[in-house]
Amino acid sequence: MSALSSENINGVYIPSALLLFGTFIVKKEFVPYAVAVTAILAGLKLFTGGNKPRKVLNPTEFQEFVLKEKIDVSHNVCIYRFALPRPTDILGLPIGQHISLAATIEGQPKEVVRSYTPISSDNEAGYFDLLVKAYPQGNISKYLTTLKIGDTMKVRGPKGAMVYTPNMCRHIGMIAGGTGITPMLQIIKAVIRNRPRNGGNDTTKLDLIFANVNPDDILLKEELDMLAAEDPDFNIYYVLNNPPQGWTGGVGFVTPEMIKEHLPAPASDVKILLCGPPPMISAMKKATESLGYTKARPVSKLEDQVFCF
């Protein structure tokens, strides 16, 4: 018997049966009213799901979710907010994992599937947010720009080898490029939300190197800066290819020297997370290996010291 059906039996059917039985014994003419009350209670239970969060993701089948809002971040970056079936629903996405989006694109021989990490979490019920940059050659990212409010997107998940758990290591170093910030933000927010001062137990130290081309390309900078300001164990080092005058962060590409200065040194309780454009990730794999970190595998596993999303 499923948890839901067991809950329904204990929460609705047994009390309802007792109500009907008691009414029949005490006053038979009130039985129709008791039946009506029972039907209403059962309907409310079925419709609301008991107001408990329901995980809606399915790892084997695509489901369609309705676009409810589009928030422009820049000329080519947008936050897409998709509604879940019920206001109390959650995606059910473990921290560190991602989802697959699928669409039929004109000119493509088969359905196109791409992976994205929501910037929202299961702490926010009723919807999920995707931060997406539209690339000229990006099939799904361009497809998303054509969606209108009320249109649907096919989603499947969760997927991915990374599942973050509190205190899985002492210190995490992160290197992100562009929209590669999304899985990092997911983990950063989860760690800070679970700090001892917030009633949790996560003491993991976090250091982030975030590389972009121009200042306007730094996604979610305001939120990242706010998180760093409130948490002394989270530090950010920004790197720009085209820095403005007076820039105090890094300049050019992320170098081994930057990694050595701003991220934790290799140790058994240290993990390095990478996410960004393929050329950047290739360079960062070589850089981390040159500094003594364990060589990154072609396909990362949870236990790897250097993990690539």
Swiss-Prot record:
Q: How does it assemble?
A: Monomer. Component of the 2-(3-amino-3-carboxypropyl)histidine synthase complex composed of dph1, dph2, dph3 and a NADH-dependent reductase, predominantly cbr1.
Q: Which family does it belong to?
A: Belongs to the flavoprotein pyridine nucleotide cytochrome reductase family.
The record's listing under PROSITE patterns reads: FAD_FR
The protein depicted here goes by the name NADH-cytochrome b5 reductase 1
Transmembrane ranges? 30-50
Alphabetical list of SUPFAM superfamilies matching this protein: Ferredoxin reductase-like, C-terminal NADP-linked domain, Riboflavin synthase domain-like
Gene Ontology annotations of biological process type:
protein histidyl modification to diphthamide; tRNA wobble base 5-methoxycarbonylmethyl-2-thiouridinylation
List the InterPro entries. Answer: CBR-like, Cbr1-like_FAD-bd_dom, FAD-bd_FR_type, Flavoprot_Pyr_Nucl_cyt_Rdtase, FNR_nucleotide-bd, OxRdtase_FAD/NAD-bd, Riboflavin_synthase-like_b-brl
Q: Give residues annotated as binding FAD.
A: 145-160, 171-208
What GO MF terms are annotated?
A: cytochrome-b5 reductase activity, acting on NAD(P)H; NADH dehydrogenase activity; transferase activity
- Which cofactors is this protein said to need? FAD
Where in the cell? Mitochondrion outer membrane
Gene encoding the protein: cbr1
A single GO CC term for this protein reads:
mitochondrial outer membrane
Pathway membership, UniProt: Protein modification; peptidyl-diphthamide biosynthesis
Protein's job: NADH-dependent reductase for dph3 and cytochrome b5. Required for the first step of diphthamide biosynthesis, a post-translational modification of histidine which occurs in elongation factor 2. Dph1 and dph2 transfer a 3-amino-3-carboxypropyl (ACP) group from S-adenosyl-L-methionine (SAM) to a histidine residue, the reaction is assisted by a reduction system comprising dph3 and a NADH-dependent reductase, predominantly cbr1. By reducing dph3, also involved in the formation of the tRNA wobble base modification mcm5s 2U (5-methoxycarbonylmethyl-2-thiouridine), mediated by the elongator complex.
Name the enzyme's class. oxidoreductase
Q: Quote any Pfam family the record assigns.
A: NAD_binding_1
Topologically, how does it sit relative to the membrane?
Answer: Single-pass membrane protein
Per the record, the major location class is mitochondrion
**Coiled-coil features, chain-numbered ranges:** none
Source organism per UniProt: Aspergillus fumigatus (strain ATCC MYA-4609 / CBS 101355 / FGSC A1100 / Af293)
Q: Which UniProt keywords apply?
A: FAD, Flavoprotein, Membrane, Mitochondrion, Mitochondrion outer membrane, NAD, Oxidoreductase, Transferase, Transmembrane, Transmembrane helix
Enzyme Commission no: 1.6.2.2
Q: Which residues form the FAD-binding FR-type domain?
A: 60-165
Reactions the enzyme catalyzes: 2 Fe(III)-[cytochrome b5] + NADH = 2 Fe(II)-[cytochrome b5] + NAD(+) + H(+); 2 Fe(3+)-[Dph3] + NADH = 2 Fe(2+)-[Dph3] + NAD(+) + H(+)
